[in-house]
């Protein structure tokens, strides 16, 4: 099969690779679409330890070609793959916290992933996709679930003021989720003018450039209280410090 193989940091090549060998508890997936995220860039640059050579990619969808014959999952089923693999036996796995499994691995980081024609994945890690979700949209489900997890932890109450800082993919998804949860207002903060414009199209009640404009604007939109919740999506210390200025105490 053809695959994108990382041989060393910065050396990603399209080349022939062996088709993965499917185990009895796995399905073989013909990968049709994938996504590239910040983790992939760090792996490519060598910022995350990984074995070489490696077929990258952990955001992927495709069709089952072998290994499943249930009503929901069978040959030809269009599916999304959960790339987080766990042992299924430890305390964390039994507690619904498989992402904390000490023996957990990630497809596309610790073992070959989805930037090839085929990938083998455990049957417990593949889910049927509804036809209402397009092939172009579906790879975003993986990052959407991480955002959704954060919102469930935050427990937004309708009418609370929420600020989203940073408008990459995660930030724009957080904006839309906050609106769905009933936050009002939802304020978006970024240095990028075109991202502020996009945020307004996606439902932001107000957008501001980071810095003094964001602080003044947030105070004005919350009657001087500050935001009930700030979602920081940049991951840099100066932005985190600014988040503490925007949130109420």
State where each predicted segment sits.
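NAD(P)H dinucleotide-binding glycine-rich loop of Rossmann-like/cofactor-binding domains
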Residues: 87-165
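Glycine- and other small-residue-rich loops at beta-strand/loop junctions that grip anionic moieties
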Residues: 53, 82, 118, 139, ...
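Mid-domain Rossmann-like dinucleotide-binding core that forms the NAD(H)/NADP(H) cofactor-binding site
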Residues: 133-212, 216
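Glycine-rich beta-strand-centered segment in the early N-terminal region that forms part
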Residues: 20-34, 45-91, 130-132
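Cytochrome P450 core scaffold surrounding the K-helix E-X-X-R motif
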Residues: 39-43
């Amino acid at each position: 099969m053809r695959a994108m193989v990382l041989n060393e940091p910065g050396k990603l090549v399209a080349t022939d690779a062996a088709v993965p060998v499917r185990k009895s508890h796995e399905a073989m997936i013909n990968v049709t679409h994938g996504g590239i995220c910040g983790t992939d860039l760090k792996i490519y640059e060598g910022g995350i330890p990984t074995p070489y050579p490696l077929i990258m990619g952990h955001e992927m969808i495709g069709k089952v070609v072998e290994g499943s014959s249930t009503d929901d999952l069978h040959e030809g089923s269009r599916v999304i793959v959960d790339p987080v693999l766990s042992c299924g036996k430890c305390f964390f796995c039994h507690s619904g916290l498989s992402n904390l499994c000490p023996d957990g691995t990630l497809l596309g980081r610790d073992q070959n992933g989805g930037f090839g024609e085929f990938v083998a994945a455990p049957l417990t890690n593949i889910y049927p996709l509804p036809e209402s979700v397009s092939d172009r949209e579906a790879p975003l489900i993986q990052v959407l679930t991480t955002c959704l997890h954060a919102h469930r932890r935050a427990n937004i109450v309708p009418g609370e003021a929420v600020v989203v800082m940073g408008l990459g993919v995660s930030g724009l998804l957080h904006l839309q989720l906050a609106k769905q949860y009933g936050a009002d207002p939802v304020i978006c903060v970024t240095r990028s003018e075109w991202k502020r414009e996009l945020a307004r199209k996606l439902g932001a009640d107000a957008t501001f450039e980071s810095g003094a404009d964001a602080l003044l604007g947030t105070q004005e939109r919350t009657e001087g209280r500050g935001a009930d919740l700030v979602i920081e999506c940049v991951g840099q210390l100066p932005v985190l410090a600014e988040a503490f200025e925007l949130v109420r105490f």
